[in-house]
UniProtKB/Swiss-Prot annotation:
Subcellular location: Cell membrane
Known role: Part of an ABC transporter complex involved in ferric-petrobactin uptake.
Lipidation (N-palmitoyl cysteine): 18
Membrane topology: Lipid-anchor
Domain Fe/B12 periplasmic-binding: 54-324
Residues linked to a lipid group, S-diacylglycerol cysteine type: 18
Consequences of knocking out this gene: Deletion mutant exhibits a growth defect in iron-depleted media. Mutant is able to produce and secrete petrobactin, but petrobactin accumulates in the culture supernatants. Mutant is also significantly attenuated in a murine model of inhalational anthrax.
Gene: fpuA
Family: Belongs to the bacterial solute-binding protein 8 family.
SUPFAM superfamilies tied to this protein: Helical backbone' metal receptor
Identification of the protein by name: Petrobactin-binding protein FpuA
Signal peptide bounds: 1-17
Length: 324
């Protein structure tokens, strides 16, 4: 009987100990979510008493970052055009308040929302930094940091935003999913055994009634992604471009005409079917004559976050391996 009682006491104490450990872990986790944090960004460091719950976002890439983390902002700039031009699986809910354009956000509307945090890009936010900081702690990011490697900056910024809203574990999963998508896209390209993996990539549109191209440079997010897929950019800009592209005209495409040409164009502004049709400078390009052109969706956002990068990688692999 004593032996049975002793065993019972040991089991009871063990169960109590396990219960206490679980409670302690819960308390620790809760405490961590309420701890003060420091966010590093292009304008320095910003301290928050605890992770932000009510966030206003004034640039699309950071809106995408928040949404990928499962966080709906309370306010967001230019929601209508975000939904039109940013091809990602997660969209803002109907409850998110539009706070004006990215270029001219509505400060009164932002103030009315009483946010815990404002996120924007430094090249836009610097001019209204004081006004924004009077409303709420403000962080500003800049893609041209991280040695002007837009992909490296994107991932680091995403981690900082995840930290700012207490979603670091969720952030790790988003980045892991992105890496898996890259690996899958690369495997698909390798399986296709392409003879030519040289590429040039551009956005095409009309500017001042002239067919215009943004030819992407090595430091751009998009070409850092395609590099991970085993593709090689052939466009030489001659210098590092802070924006990740060089804006030019059709005549400049001669330097990359031996490559596969990957392009993004909106259906309502398809310059290839309108202004360039019959244009000798366009029609005589080698990739045009040899049908080495690969169209991505018009809402492929090349200045975005992990979901945009994932979409880009998947699309590139699909179009490059599709039979023509």
């Amino acid at each position: 009987m004593k032996k049975i009682l002793s065993i019972f006491i040991v089991v009871f104490l063990f169960a109590v100990g396990c219960g206490q450990q679980k409670e302690e872990k819960k308390e620790t986790k809760a405490d961590n979510k309420n701890q003060a944090i420091t966010i590093k960004h292009a304008e320095g460091e910003t301290k928050l008493d605890k992770p932000a719950k009510k966030v206003v976002v004034l640039e699309w890439v950071y809106s995408e970052d928040l949404l990928a983390l499962g966080v709906q902002p309370v306010g967001m700039a230019d929601i209508k055009n975000y939904n039109k031009w940013v091809n990602t699986k997660t969209k803002p809910s109907k409850d998110v308040v539009d706070v004006g354009t990215r270029q001219q956000p509505n400060l009164e509307e932002i103030s009315r929302l009483k946010p815990d945090l404002i996120i924007t890009a430094s090249f836009r936010g610097k001019a209204i930094k004081n006004e924004l900081e009077q409303i709420a702690p403000t962080v500003m990011f800049d893609p041209s940091t991280s040695n002007n490697d837009h992909f490296a900056e994107m991932t680091e910024t995403f981690k900082q935003i995840a930290k700012a809203v207490g979603k670091e574990e969720e952030g790790k999963k988003v980045l892991a999913d992105m890496d898996k998508a890259f690996a899958d896209a690369k495997a698909k390209i390798e399986k296709a055994d392409l003879k030519d993996k040289n590429i040039a990539m551009a956005q095409a549109f009309t500017a001042k009634n002239v067919p215009t191209f943004r030819i992407l440079t090595d430091n751009s997010l998009a070409l850092q992604v395609t590099k991970k897929l085993g593709l090689t950019n052939t466009f030489e800009a001659g210098k590092s471009e802070p924006d990740g592209f060089k804006q030019t005209t059709v005549e400049s495409l001669q330097s990359v005409q031996d490559s596969n040409f990957i392009y993004i164009v909106a259906d309502e502004d398809n310059i290839f079917d309108t202004q360039l049709k019959g244009n000798p400078a366009w029609e005589e390009l080698k990739f045009k004559k040899e049908n080495k052109m690969y169209k991505l969706k018009g809402d492929t956002w090349i200045f975005g976050g992990p979901e945009s990068a994932t979409s880009l990688a998947t699309q590139v692999a699909d179009v490059m391996t599709a039979k023509k």
